[in-house]
């Protein structure tokens, strides 16, 4: 796993996002958990944002196509958003195995408010109280990227690349010192 680590030292608040290719295998999840442990052991606060496992969203889209030629956009958002929830839970299990307190959060629980453009929603604002509460309890919030909720309570997805957008928006809202976008790559060009 490649993750550019900053040289900032002094109890930084870091938002770190892991993409789908980084959360596909158990050894990757364990590596992410160990990196998170190192981060908090040096005194930093950490928010993790995760994508669905590589190929998972496409698989869920194919599942919908098996039963309908024209599913509603809101139903599709409910279906394809579950991949991120699975990644959050899997990572939480790995962190808990290392004795690291954490709490998983859907986009809704994280307070990510969007417009109603299902399948390609835009973040309007973030109500970060729950993320701040978890950080204040010295836990790692693990936020499902790609998800949000309308002001009417309807689940939305942000479209491809939405987990990156989620991480940057959370970092901005929390005035984080660092926002890291991590991936599983052979090298950096």
Task: Identify the residue ranges that each predicted region occupies.
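Nucleotide/pyrophosphate-binding catalytic subdomain
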Residues: 5-189
């Amino acid at each position: 796993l490649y993750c550019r680590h900053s040289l900032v030292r002094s109890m930084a608040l870091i938002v770190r996002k892991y993409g789908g290719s980084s959360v596909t295998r158990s050894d990757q999840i364990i590596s992410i958990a160990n990196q998170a442990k190192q981060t908090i052991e040096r005194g930093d606060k950490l928010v993790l944002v995760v994508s669905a496992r590589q190929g998972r969203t496409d698989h869920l889209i194919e599942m919908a196509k098996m039963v309908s030629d024209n599913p509603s956009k809101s139903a599709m958002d409910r279906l394809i958003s579950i991949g991120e929830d699975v990644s959050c839970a899997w990572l939480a299990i790995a962190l808990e195995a290392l004795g690291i307190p954490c709490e998983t959060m859907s986009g809704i629980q994280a307070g990510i408010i969007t417009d109603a453009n299902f399948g390609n929603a835009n973040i309007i604002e973030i109500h970060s109280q729950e993320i701040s509460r978890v950080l204040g309890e010295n836990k790692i919030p693990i936020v499902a990227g790609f998800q949000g909720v309308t002001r009417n309570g309807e689940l939305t997805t942000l479209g491809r690349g939405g987990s990156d957008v989620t991480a940057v928006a959370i970092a901005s809202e929390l005035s984080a010192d660092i926002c890291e976008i991590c991936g599983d790559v052979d090298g950096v060009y």
